[in-house]
Design a protein with these regions (language model features):
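Positively charged, polyanion-binding regions of nucleic-acid-associated proteins
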Residues: 2-30
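Short glycine-rich, basic-tinged beta-strand/loop micro-motifs
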Residues: 24-43, 98-106
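Charge-enriched amphipathic alpha-helical scaffolds
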Residues: 28, 38-67
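Charged low-complexity interaction tracts in eukaryotic proteins
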Residues: 60-92, 161
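Short helix/turn-capping signatures at newly exposed starts of structured segments
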Residues: 95-126
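A cross-family detector of function-defining hotspots
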Residues: 114-152
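A short, surface-exposed beta-strand/turn
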Residues: 149-162
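A short, surface-exposed interaction/processing loop segment used at functional sites
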Residues: 160-177
Length: 177
């Protein structure tokens, strides 16, 4: 089992959701497909293997996340993070400043892809940008050295504004964009 990938992913998703919703001290419920959880934990992507792995993961990190409830949901699991866990993760997350900047930029009326790229470049000189090469998105963007995070950001410019979607590297590759 490789828990660090799930820990990094959860940290990024919790911070992003808390910042977008403005709820740094509220519980969050996050739904993950079994395939993503299996890739992140390095275990078989079936519910019988994942449930005990998730319970062990959160038991070992109760000081950070609190008492997380792990429940089956459709083709994956719902991870219910209590308010105190959300607050601790947001306070400790190294990528919070970048995400705050990116979210504020994306929420600015008329924000363009260039505006979003500028947010990346305010936080690193090692920003990789390439055409996405698919019909879903215009650009693929990520930090070459994984700092401040290792997510893959897909930027789409449409209807006069730009938006982004964020994926773990493994999920991005598995989706085959």
């Amino acid at each position: 089992m490789n828990p660090s990938k799930l820990e990094q992913n959860l940290s990024g998703v919790i911070v992003e959701m808390a910042l977008k919703l403005g709820l740094n001290h509220a519980p969050l419920s996050l739904n993950y497909p079994c395939a993503s959880l299996g890739r992140m934990l390095g275990v078989e992507a079936d519910p019988q293997a994942l449930k005990p792995a998730l319970e062990a993961f959160f038991a070992a990190r109760a000081g950070l996340y609190g008492a997380v409830h792990v429940e089956p949901h459709e083709d994956g699991f719902c991870l219910a993070i209590p308010a105190e866990g959300v607050a601790r993760v947001v306070a400790q997350a190294p990528a919070a400043a970048f995400l705050r900047d990116l979210i504020q930029t994306a929420q600015t009326p008329g924000a363009t892809a260039d505006d979003l790229l500028a947010a990346f470049r305010r936080h690193s000189d090692r920003v990789h940008v390439e055409p996405a090469g698919n019909d879903e998105f215009d650009l693929l963007v990520y930090f070459e050295d994984g700092v401040p995070d290792d997510f893959r950001y897909c930027i789409d410019q449409h209807d006069g504004f730009a938006s982004y979607h964020r994926f773990s590297r493994e999920d991005y590759e598995a989706f085959g964009f």
